[in-house]
Amino acid sequence: MENYRLILFSALVLVLFLMWDAWQTDYGPIPLLPPPPQPTASSGESSPVLPEAVPDAPPPEMADMDTAPILTGQKTIEVKTDLLAIKIGMASGDLYEVQLLNYPVSLKKPNEPVTLLHKRDPDLFVTQSGLRAASGPSITHETVQFSAPKTYYELIEDESSLKVPLTWEDENGIKVTKTYIFQRDSYQIDLNIKIENGTDQAWMGRAYAQFSRTPPESGGMFARSYVGAVFSTQEQEYQKVDFGDLASQSFDRRSSGGWVAMIQHYFVAAWVPREQGTNYYYGKHVQNSRYIAGVMPPQQTIAPGESGQFNLALFTGPKIQDQLAAVAPKLNLTVDYGKLTILAEPLFWLMSWFHNLVGNWGWAIVLLTFVVKLVFFKLSQTSYRSMARMRKLQPRLLALKERYGDDRQKVGQAMMELYRKEKVNPMGGCLPIVVQIPVFIALYWMLLESVELRQAPFIFWIQDLTSKDPYYILPLLMGVSMFVQQKLSPAPTDPIQAKVMALMPVMFTVFFVMFPAGLVLYWVVNNILSIAQQWYITRQIEQEG
């Protein structure tokens, strides 16, 4: 039973390994994708049309929506709001560049904003939208050239919203107007697609809105985050579908409500249909290492002389939970806390409350650590009392080992008898700590996923809580604090176990060298509080005699 601390140590190492592996999955290098399946000879090259009389059937015309190359040198409309700088291509009427003005690329480049949507060869991430018709002309991002009254729009100080209309009209009397609506202090962009039918025949079809994306090149460790599609449907409210999945099998679902998004670390772009009825969600590999993920709202029929419209919302911005939740139900799940969301969300709420109180995310983490320590105070007290009693028994345990030598059975029996006599539970110090592990894991994911901590300073040399400590001071302090904790705990009687336990601070220091400073800060503060509590309880036990 004296091996309990070695078991606990092994459990903690396993937890760290699993966290490291999970980090590599979502924040490590992106793996090479399998080659996409080749089309068979019978599949043909042309795009099939939308089934005219079967609106509930899968709309197969989306299969080749992205075969046209992205046009370069096209005429551009530039839009600037208080939060966004946007470029819209007139050749398709779609957004091909979105810059987030309040989010610099790095602390070293404070005047260079993050570019979420872009077309930087070979990396591509753009929106595409249009109309696919079963009866009448299709107006797609591949086939039309829009016009606009101006080429530059800016949301001025006394305006709360800004409209950017783009129009296209054919010789037969079909007129399409795409209107983008921007709001002050918002990353949501509303898109209204209006169809005016000036012909003598009904127009029937669907709108589509999608993302076209190439997987970013693989970077070094911690250089890349998970990049991929996410769908929310009635069947599954949050479903990741990465590029590897789409390379091997296309995605299609029908659902009322829902949304489709492309996510990456800290930022998200999402299409949200606003029409009533059943939406069709899809994703697939197309060509030139490009992937699409999108949605088609329900089909509409527009009689001659009438007009109709499709409405969608586009969110392009940081993963700020309350803003995401206001755009669409469950969109806040793109802030992915993993399987322990039920614990991570209240922890984030409490940390945010502390930030509003003190105005610094680093001090908010410190205060959050105090609260977590207070919640587990009684459990920790039980653990440290058990350790203190074990420490008092240490000389007698060593005497038993000397008396019985290599007879492990007799040593074990004698130790158990001593534990019963002194009313000491050798596992009493283990269970309370194990119970706290889920909370630590929830804190881990909460600190990693919170865009609010991105480039947030603490004090002195810590200028970004989401980056590693540039001078490794916090990891070293953590190692020292763990070493001090060990000195307050009973040493293992087995020499091999003693050597393994002695390596524990070194191993944890190495593990945490590359972890974000905010997470290491939590661990350091937690260790310091644990040392104070353990020292106080140990002194009490020793004074009791």
Curated annotation (Swiss-Prot):
Any GO molecular function: membrane insertase activity
UniProt region (Disordered), positions on chain: 34-59
Q: InterPro entries given for it?
A: Membr_insert_YidC (IPR019998), Membr_insert_YidC_N (IPR028053), YidC/ALB3/OXA1/COX18 (IPR001708), YidC/Oxa/ALB_C (IPR028055), YidC_ALB_C (IPR047196), YidC_periplasmic_sf (IPR038221)
Q: How does it sit in the membrane?
A: Multi-pass membrane protein
Main location per the UniProt record: membrane
Localization annotation: Cell inner membrane
Q: Any idea which UniProt keywords this protein has?
A: Cell inner membrane, Cell membrane, Chaperone, Membrane, Protein transport, Transmembrane, Transmembrane helix, Transport
GO terms classed as biological process: protein insertion into membrane; protein transport
Pfam families to which the protein is assigned, alphabetical: 60KD_IMP (PF02096), YidC_periplas (PF14849)
Indicate the transmembrane segments per the record: 6-26, 357-377, 428-448, 505-525
Q: Record's Gene Ontology CC terms? A: plasma membrane
Q: Which family does it belong to?
A: Belongs to the OXA1/ALB3/YidC family. Type 1 subfamily.
The record's function comment reads:
Required for the insertion and/or proper folding and/or complex formation of integral membrane proteins into the membrane. Involved in integration of membrane proteins that insert both dependently and independently of the Sec translocase complex, as well as at least some lipoproteins. Aids folding of multispanning membrane proteins.
Q: Its quaternary structure? A: Interacts with the Sec translocase complex via SecD. Specifically interacts with transmembrane segments of nascent integral membrane proteins during membrane integration.
* Alphabetized PANTHER family for the sequence: CYTOCHROME C OXIDASE ASSEMBLY PROTEIN COX18, MITOCHONDRIAL, OXA1
Protein name according to UniProt: Membrane protein insertase YidC
